[in-house]
């Protein structure tokens, strides 16, 4: 666990005021977000059956919390890591049309998370997914969605300033786009995290694209599950965060895999055994729509807008006591 304690840190709001601000941000953001992207709110599962392949495998090494249920024999049930796969199936199941989408108030447990100022074993985010056409599986479609999300975040900055002027952390007015390879070329002697910090400190806000494949150096910028994002059409929204003097990731998102990209990515990480799972069969047989989607961290957004130094100030969870 790497903990940063900012010198002369002033949280601005009391605990009670912080809770009021959190409620305001969550309620206001999701309404505006849903309008901007044409999304309807859906209830979401806390757990899924392991055999469906619907859980998010993250980087492939994190193990989900699992259990059995009295009425289901030895069937393994898993607490979700995210709803990345479930959402795509839900769009088909609930009959969403072209350019319609959903968002959920997703709660997850990631017991193997490396804890720090931003990371908790408890994950709360708006998970969203939207139907697009095959022809819209492009970088421009991805960028357009990113700009819409950035617009909502900037809108929230002004809304929070109006309600809680003493707590606002000011955000940049523009988001910049670049790929992980471009970033490696700019800072070849830095680690991926150092590169993110360097570019965000320089530009303020960045959408860093194409995360998953190995770069020219032979290293990956970061790990990504091979069976939901297309690694050529994904990315992270990153802000420079002065209170901690480093970048903060607010959203990970992307255009989802089609059959071809999924097979290539599964082969790359030696996970082709997943192709037999129901979810993967639906993609191979084109039984689910083409989509774009992602997750927006609720607690991290509250941190960003309120200038908080630790995620524990905006959510209730557990951390090691130093």
Curated annotation (Swiss-Prot):
Pathway: Amino-acid biosynthesis; L-asparagine biosynthesis; L-asparagine from L-aspartate (ammonia route): step 1/1
GO biological process annotation, one example: L-asparagine biosynthetic process
N-terminal signal peptide: none
The protein's Enzyme Commission number: 6.3.1.1
Cellular-component GO terms for this entry: cytosol
Family: Belongs to the class-II aminoacyl-tRNA synthetase family. AsnA subfamily.
Name of the protein in its database record: Aspartate--ammonia ligase
Protein's organism: Lactiplantibacillus plantarum (strain ATCC BAA-793 / NCIMB 8826 / WCFS1) (Lactobacillus plantarum)
Lineage: Bacteria, Bacillati, Bacillota, Bacilli, Lactobacillales
């Amino acid at each position: 666990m790497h903990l940063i304690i900012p010198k002369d840190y002033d949280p601005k709001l009391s605990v009670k005021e912080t809770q009021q601000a959190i409620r305001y941000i969550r309620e206001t953001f999701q309404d505006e977000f849903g309008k901007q992207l044409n999304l309807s709110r859906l209830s979401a599962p806390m757990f899924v059956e392991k055999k469906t392949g619907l859980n998010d495998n993250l980087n492939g090494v994190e193990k989900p919390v699992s259990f059995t249920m009295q009425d289901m024999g030895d069937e393994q049930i898993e607490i979700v890591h995210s709803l990345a796969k479930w959402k795509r199936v839900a769009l088909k199941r609930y009959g969403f049309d072209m350019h319609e989408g959903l968002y959920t108030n997703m709660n997850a447990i990631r017991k193997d998370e490396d804890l720090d100022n931003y990371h908790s074993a408890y994950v709360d985010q708006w998970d969203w997914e939207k139907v697009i056409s095959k022809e819209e599986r492009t970088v421009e479609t991805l960028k357009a969605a990113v700009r819409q999300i950035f617009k909502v975040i900037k809108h929230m900055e002004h809304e929070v300033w109006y309600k809680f002027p003493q707590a606002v952390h000011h955000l940049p007015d523009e988001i910049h786009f670049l790929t992980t390879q471009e970033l490696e070329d700019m800072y070849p002697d830095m680690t991926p995290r150092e590169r993110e910090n360097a570019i965000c400190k320089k530009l303020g806000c960045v959408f860093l694209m194409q995360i998953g494949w190995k770069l020219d150096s032979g290293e990956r910028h970061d790990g990504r599950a091979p069976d939901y994002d297309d690694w050529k059409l994904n990315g992270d929204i990153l802000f420079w965060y002065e209170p901690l003097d480093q970048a903060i990731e607010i959203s990970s998102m992307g255009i989802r895999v089609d059959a071809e990209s999924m097979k290539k990515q599964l082969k790359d990480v030696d996970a082709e055994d997943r192709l037999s799972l129901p979810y993967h069969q639906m993609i191979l047989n084109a039984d689910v729509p083409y989509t774009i989607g992602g997750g927006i961290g609720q607690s991290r957004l509250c941190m960003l807008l309120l200038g908080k130094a630790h995620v524990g100030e905006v959510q209730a969870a557990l951390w090691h006591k130093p």
